[in-house]
Amino acid sequence: MKVAVLGAGAWGTALAGHLAVRHDTLLWAREPALVADLSASHENARYLAGVALPASLRYEADLAAALDHALADNALCVVATPVAGLRGLFRAMRDAGKVPAHVVWLCKGFEADSQLMPHQVVAAELPEHKSNGVLSGPSFAREVGQGLPVALTIASASAACRERTVAAFHHGAMRIYTGDDVVGVEVGGAVKNVLAIATGIADGLGLGLNARAALITRGLAEMSRLGVTLGGRAETFTGLTGLGDLILTATGDLSRNRTVGVQLAAGRTLDDILGALGHVAEGVRCAQAVLAIARAHAIEMPITQAVCAVLFDGVAPRDAVSALLRRDSKAE
C-alpha cells in the first residue's frame, strides 16, 4: 500500500516510521532543510531525536509530489499537522485538484477562531469527500517510534476509510480499533489536553495522588458532558480516546500539556514554557475554545475554567486550586 504522511513533527515522524515497515511510505515536511536532514540521517533530530527511522522511508518537501503518492489506488493519506494547519492543508489539496480517496487526520483540538472540530473543518473545505476520519488514542510519539505497544482508534462514518486505516496501521506492536463516533473521539482528544494542564499544575504544587485522581475523574465528567451535548456517545469517553488518552496525558512525563501545568506551578510564565518546549501544546491552544463552547451550551466545566484563568487571566495556580476546593458540595 502507498501511504503519504503530511507533517514531520514528532507524531507524524513516529507513525511514518511504523508505516514504512510494511508499506511504501512517503513523509512530507514543509521545510526543505528538514527533508534534507531526514534523508541524510534517517532521524528527525529536531522533533524525535534518537529514534532511528527505516531506510525504506522516503521524504519529500513538495506537497504536490506527496499528494501524487497518495493518489494511487487504495492509497492512504495521513494528515499529521496541528489543528491550526489543518484548513490550509485541505484547501491546498482542493485547489491543486489532488484530493486522496482516503484521508485520516491525527490532530487534537478545536480550530481557534471558528471553534470547529477537525471533521467540521475538513467538511467545510472538502464537502464532497466522505472516506475520511480521525485516528486517536493514548499514545506518545517517542514510544511509538521505539516500537512499544500501543492501541489506537480510527473513527469514521466510512467503512472504506476504517478498512484502509486498519490495513495500513494494524501490525507489529500497534493495535487498531474501529468506530464511527467522530465527534466523541475529537472532543475527547481536545479536552484531555486541557485537563492534563490541570493535573500538571496539581502535581507541580505537590498536591498529591488523591488530588490527581480527583482531577482526572471529575475532568472525565466535564469531557463527557461536553461531548454528549455536541453529539458524541457516552461510551466513547470511557474508551481509548477518552479515559485512556486522558490518563496517559494527565500522568505521563512525556506529556507536553502536563509539563506546561507543572512549569506554571513552578512560577514560570507561559511564554517561557512554550518557548522552551519547542513543540505544540494543544491544550494551551484550544482551552479558550473549549470553555467558550461549554458556555454557549450552558455546560459547567469548572476545571477547564480554572485552567483558562491560570493561562490567560493571570490567576495564580494555587489560587485557582483554592477556588475549585471552595465550590459548593453537589451530587456526583
From Swiss-Prot:
Q: Which residues bind sn-glycerol 3-phosphate?
A: K108, G137, S139, K192, D245, S255, R256, N257
What does UniProt give as GO cellular component?
A: cytosol
* Stated family: Belongs to the NAD-dependent glycerol-3-phosphate dehydrogenase family.
Q: Lineage, please?
A: Bacteria, Pseudomonadati, Pseudomonadota, Betaproteobacteria, Burkholderiales
Q: Is the keyword Aminoacyl-tRNA synthetase assigned to this protein?
A: no
Gene3D superfamilies given for it?
N-(1-d-carboxylethyl)-l-norvaline Dehydrogenase, domain 2, NAD(P)-binding Rossmann-like Domain
Q: Name the pathway.
A: Membrane lipid metabolism; glycerophospholipid metabolism
Q: Which UniProt keywords apply?
A: Cytoplasm, Lipid biosynthesis, Lipid metabolism, NAD, NADP, Nucleotide-binding, Oxidoreductase, Phospholipid biosynthesis, Phospholipid metabolism
- Residues of the active site are K192 (proton acceptor)
According to its UniProt record, where is this protein located? Cytoplasm
Swiss-Prot/TrEMBL catalytic activity: sn-glycerol 3-phosphate + NAD(+) = dihydroxyacetone phosphate + NADH + H(+); sn-glycerol 3-phosphate + NADP(+) = dihydroxyacetone phosphate + NADPH + H(+)
A Gene Ontology biological process annotation?
glycerol-3-phosphate biosynthetic process
Mind telling me which HAMAP family this protein's record contains? Answer: NAD_Glyc3P_dehydrog
Relate the protein's function as given in its record: Catalyzes the reduction of the glycolytic intermediate dihydroxyacetone phosphate (DHAP) to sn-glycerol 3-phosphate (G3P), the key precursor for phospholipid synthesis.
Enzyme Commission number, as recorded: 1.1.1.94
- Major subcellular location class: cytoplasm
Official protein name in the record: Glycerol-3-phosphate dehydrogenase [NAD(P)+]
Gene of this entry: gpsA
Q: Which GO terms describe its molecular function?
A: glycerol-3-phosphate dehydrogenase [NAD(P)+] activity; NAD binding
PANTHER family per record: GLYCEROL-3-PHOSPHATE DEHYDROGENASE (PTHR11728), GLYCEROL-3-PHOSPHATE DEHYDROGENASE [NAD(+)] 2, CHLOROPLASTIC (PTHR11728:SF1)
